[in-house]
Curated annotation (Swiss-Prot):
One of its GO terms (molecular function) is ATP binding. Transmembrane segments: none annotated. It is found in: Cytoplasm. Belongs to the class-I aminoacyl-tRNA synthetase family. Glutamate--tRNA ligase type 1 subfamily. CDD domains: GluRS_core (cd00808). One of its GO terms (cellular component) is cytosol. It comes from Xanthomonas oryzae pv. oryzae (strain KACC10331 / KXO85). Gene3D superfamilies: 1.10.10.350, HUPs. GO terms for biological process: glutamyl-tRNA aminoacylation. This is Glutamate--tRNA ligase.
Length: 467
């Protein structure tokens, strides 16, 4: 049977980093085996599900490059199908109506706890064969097997056994006429032919219940792979503050989508000591059975390292649109400065994110209005007008403005004055950027443009003259 996996988020919020890893592993497993990847939106929680959250999930999937073969399929559009299957179970005596009030259910739980037993439904209506009636407390409960054990071999966790005596008769249809999670996902996965269910290990306790429903329906049981959670850098549960952010916040923070994909792939899975993978290598090497059963820790420094690798090695033209996105967020007029691809070349060895790159690049897009006082005192003092003036003269005469032609002009200026290159470069660097730190001086001047560079040199000469 062809592999079919699914990613099934609930649209009650954004797609966080743990959900993105789940989607990636489902996508990789399907792609590696030549199967299909299905996107299902589990939106039966009508109070908390929102269209904004759905849109955010779809946007994040697109940004990450996790295309799906089917979907998005919405559970709210399948309610009639869930009712059909529930009625089938009722007709076969595998489910039943129950009408207990909230107070009665609370009393059951309190009685169980008083006996130091697990709070649960006591099966009061199990054998009463109650008919349907219009009642605000009406639910449909599944007749869980009383004896025996549920056994399944998890692809990550290994063999898991749960005694049926640990499970009660769970509700499969609520009073509001909607199915519960454990029932809907079984019907969905059955109808959609899902062969591997890859999800977080917070769902392990749901699995025995779901397997019993599969058995009652005579449906094939998929294989299960329960991934351990992602912890923060301190080894505690992720929070918004420690990394469990909206995937699109990683975009806003300046990470490349394929860098995040590479990092997420390694967050729980490995292939020897290899850290960096091309997309094809991930498709060739990934196997969900190789996912570690222990929780992984988020390491933002490692993510930054991976991101910097791709900033250094990707085609600058492919990075440019994402840098332009960051510059636009800073209110920069892109037409007022250099081509973004040229900025990438100049800065990519110096930053870990595109956000850092954009912040450093602003100096070439906006008028230089402030100077570092220490830099001015050290490099724009009396005497600096000589190398600055010579550099200006030769830069003004450059025919074709390029990094190479700028470099030649600056070296000629140093040679003409019999100065070391640093004596020309440092005052020029302060004149162009207002600071003592910048990329290679030829790139720094080139990115300012001929007109911009000459104007900034003139301003520096004026500053020296006024000192």
């Amino acid at each position: 049977m062809a592999c079919r996996t699914r990613f099934a988020p609930s649209p009650t919020g954004y797609l966080h980093i743990g959900g993105a890893r789940t989607a990636l592993y489902c996508w990789l497993e399907a792609r590696r085996r030549g199967g299909q990847f299905v996107l299902r939106i589990e939106d039966t929680d009508r109070q908390r599900s929102t269209q904004a959250a759905i849109d955010a999930i779809l946007e994040a999937m697109q940004w990450l490059g996790l295309g799906y073969d089917e979907g998005p399929i919405y559970q709210t559009q399948r309610v009639a199908r869930y009712q059909e299957v529930a009625e089938q179970l009722l007709a076969q005596g595998k489910a039943y109506y129950a009408y207990e009030t909230r107070e009665e259910l609370d009393a059951m739980r309190e009685a169980a706890m008083a006996k130091q037993e697990k709070p649960r439904y006591d099966g009061a209506a199990r054998e009463q064969n109650l008919p349907y009636r219009d009642d605000p407390n009406r639910v449909i409960r599944f007749k869980n097997p009383i004896g025996g054990t549920v056994v399944f071999d998890d692809l990550i966790k290994g063999r898991i056994e749960i005694a049926n005596s640990e499970l009660d008769d769970m509700v499969i249809f609520r009073p509001d006429g909607l199915p519960t999670y454990n029932f809907a996902v079984v019907v969905d996965d059955w109808d959609m032919g899902i062969t591997e269910v890859i999800r977080g290990d917070d769902h392990i306790n749901n699995t025995p219940r779901q397997i019993n429903i599969y058995a009652a329906l005579g449906a094939p049981v998929p294989k299960f792979a329960h991934m351990p959670m992602i912890l923060d850098e301190q080894g505690t549960k992720l929070s918004k503050r420690t990394g469990a952010a909206d995937v699109m916040q990683y975009k806003d923070a300046g990470y490349l989508p394929h860098a995040l994909i590479n990092y997420l792939a390694r967050l729980g899975w490995s292939h020897g000591d290899q850290e960096l993978f091309t997309p094809q290598e991930l498709l060739d090497l990934f196997d969900v059975k190789d996912v570690n059963s222990k929780a992984a820790r988020l390491d933002m420094a490692k993510l930054g390292w991976v991101n910097q690798h791709y900033l250094k090695t990707d085609d600058p033209a492919s990075i440019a649109p994402q840098l332009e996105y960051q510059l636009a967020k800073l209110g920069v007029d892109l037409a007022a400065g250099p081509a973004a691809a040229d900025v990438v070349v100049a800065l990519r060895e110096r930053v870990h994110t595109l956000k850092e790159m954009a912040e450093k690049a602003v100096v070439w897009y906006q008028p230089l209005e402030t100077y570092d006082a220490a830099a001015v005192m050290k490099h724009l003092k009396l005497g600096a007008e000589v190398p600055l003036g010579k550099a200006r003269e030769l830069l003004a005469a450059v025919d074709q403005w390029s990094v190479d032609s700028v470099s030649a002009a600056l070296h000629d200026a140093a040679a003409a004055l019999e100065l070391g290159m640093g004596k020309v470069a440092q005052p020029l660097r302060v004149a162009i950027t207002g600071t003592q730190v910048s990329p290679d001086i030829s790139q720094t001047v080139y990115l300012a443009g001929r007109e911009g560079a000459l104007k900034r040199i003139d301003a520096a000469l004026t500053k020296i003259g006024a000192a």
